[in-house]
Amino acid sequence: MTKLEDHLEGIINIFHQYSVRTGHYDTLSKCELKKLITTELVNTIKNTKDQATVDRIFRDLDEDGDHQVDFKEFLSLLASVLVTAHENIHKE
């Protein structure tokens, strides 16, 4: 497995580490998303402890309005985080 493929598998595994806790095993509830963000993205997303921030992120990600974030919706967050990280690297 290449380094990139290994990282992709890691992202999937982290998603599932949190998605299996409550409700459907392949989606994140708001509580699961908050736990993932506050644990895994604490240095990347500002105000992760603020419930209003988590609510806004969840609302933005939940494109179909089912009160769950599936993997495809979660990828929107990762894409945004990666773009910001890439831009920040070039600022340094």
Curated annotation (Swiss-Prot):
EF-hand domain residues: 16-48, 49-84
SMART domains per record: EFh (SM00054), S_100 (SM01394)
Residues noted as binding Ca(2+) 2 in the record, renumbered to the chain: D62, D64, D66, Q68, E73
Binding site for Zn(2+): H16, D26, H86, H90
GO cellular component: cytoplasm; cytoskeleton; extracellular exosome; plasma membrane
GO biological process: antimicrobial humoral immune response mediated by antimicrobial peptide; endothelial cell migration; inflammatory response; innate immune response; positive regulation of canonical NF-kappaB signal transduction
Disulfide bonds: none
InterPro entries, per the entry: EF-hand-dom_pair, EF_Hand_1_Ca_BS, EF_hand_dom, S100/CaBP7/8-like_CS, S100_Ca-bd_sub
Start and end residues of each stretch annotated as Hinge domain: 38-53
Binding, Cu cation: H16, D26, H86, H90
Alphabetized UniProt keyword annotations: Calcium, Cell membrane, Copper, Cytoplasm, Cytoskeleton, Immunity, Inflammatory response, Innate immunity, Membrane, Metal-binding, Repeat, Secreted, Zinc
Membrane topology: Peripheral membrane protein
GO molecular function: calcium ion binding; calcium-dependent protein binding; RAGE receptor binding
SUPFAM superfamilies: EF-hand (SSF47473)
Binding site for Ca(2+) 1: S19, H24, T27, E32
Domain of life: Eukaryota
Record's subunit section: Homodimer. Homooligomer (tetramer or hexamer) in the presence of calcium, zinc and copper ions. Interacts with AGER and both calcium and zinc are essential for the interaction. Interacts with CACYBP in a calcium-dependent manner.
Function text: S100A12 is a calcium-, zinc- and copper-binding protein which plays a prominent role in the regulation of inflammatory processes and immune response. Its pro-inflammatory activity involves recruitment of leukocytes, promotion of cytokine and chemokine production, and regulation of leukocyte adhesion and migration. Acts as an alarmin or a danger associated molecular pattern (DAMP) molecule and stimulates innate immune cells via binding to receptor for advanced glycation endproducts (AGER).
Name of this chain's protein: Protein S100-A12
Species whose genome carries this gene: Oryctolagus cuniculus (Rabbit)
